[in-house]
């Protein structure tokens, strides 16, 4: 079992590391957000008495990078289906859920790596973790967030057959998930309806967990963040495994 999962995990990782253009291209938007918003809105944020905006913004940008990378990893399923690799994989004498788990862990590893790169860039931009001892918790939050959204991307890709449809659905999902996560603004004092929508957004708990572990500022608390992320990750991984097992070849 572990051989199948490991091989597919390693394949995802090798594809990522061999594509330097993909690595550089996927960093463009997070870096733009970090520097343009961080330094552009920084003075306004400070005048409002909210402190250093780079400190506040960085966890949200790390989460954004993980979200984009992990959820779009599902497109590789459609790509492999069109070029015949998926068929060869699915006819192998192994349970399909193992194939799905291997691909999901591979996509999550890539997304976590992207998040770590953005974290390093944020240090150059002036971000300072409040407590280095809490970095391990931030890393765990990154992993859980990556697994959650990779599983979501895989589940959606399992029921679609064309890249255009997948990209349209992902774009429809990604922007609300990101903007309702509290990545760009504090969650205190918001209208009730907006607070409800934010609490229903799973990315909110990834952002809050990163912000809590990196800066000590948490709207919920780390226990709630970890619990919600674990539960939703398990549910989406199970759903993704089921939908992946129903793919027709």
Predicted feature locations:
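Membrane-interfacial helix-loop-helix junctions in multi-pass membrane proteins
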Residues: 15, 46-48, 128, 178-235
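Pore- or pathway-lining transmembrane helices of multi-pass membrane proteins that form conduits
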Residues: 24-32, 161-181
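Residues that define the loop-to-transmembrane-helix transition and helix capping
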Residues: 20-21, 55, 97, 164, ...
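Alpha-helical transmembrane segments and their short interhelical loops
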Residues: 96, 100-170, 217-241
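Hydrophobic alpha-helical transmembrane segments of multi-pass membrane transport proteins
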Residues: 32-37, 53-124, 145, 153, ...
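Aromatic- and glycine-rich beta-strand/loop motifs that create alpha-glucan
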Residues: 1-29
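Short, hydrophobic transmembrane alpha-helix segments
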Residues: 39-50
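Short cytosolic juxtamembrane segments of multi-pass membrane proteins
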Residues: 242-249
């Amino acid at each position: 079992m572990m051989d199948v999962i490991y091989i597919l995990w390693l394949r995802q990782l090798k594809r990522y590391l061999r594509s330097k253009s993909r690595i550089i291209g996927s960093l463009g938007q997070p870096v733009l957000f970090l520097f343009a918003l961080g330094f552009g809105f920084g003075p306004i944020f400070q005048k409002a008495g909210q402190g250093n905006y780079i400190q506040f913004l960085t966890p949200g940008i790390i989460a954004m990078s993980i979200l984009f990378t992990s959820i779009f990893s599902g497109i590789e399923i459609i790509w492999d289906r069109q070029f015949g690799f998926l068929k060869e994989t699915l006819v192998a004498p192994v349970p399909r859920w193992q194939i799905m788990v291997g691909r999901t862990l591979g996509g999550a590893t890539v997304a976590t790596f992207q998040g770590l790169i953005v974290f390093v860039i944020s240090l150059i931009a002036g971000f300072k973790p409040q407590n280095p001892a809490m970095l391990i918790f931030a890393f765990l939050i990154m992993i859980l967030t990556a697994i959650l959204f990779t599983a979501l991307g895989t589940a959606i890709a399992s029921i679609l057959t064309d890249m255009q449809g997948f990209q349209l659905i992902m774009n429809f999902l990604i922007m609300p998930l990101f903007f309702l996560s509290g990545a760009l603004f504090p969650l205190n004092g918001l209208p009730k309806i907006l607070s409800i929508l934010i609490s229903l957004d799973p990315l909110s708990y990834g952002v809050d967990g990163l912000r809590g572990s990196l800066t000590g500022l948490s709207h919920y608390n780390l226990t709630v963040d970890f619990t919600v992320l674990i539960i939703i990750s398990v549910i989406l991984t199970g759903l993704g495994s089921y939908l992946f097992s129903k793919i027709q070849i």
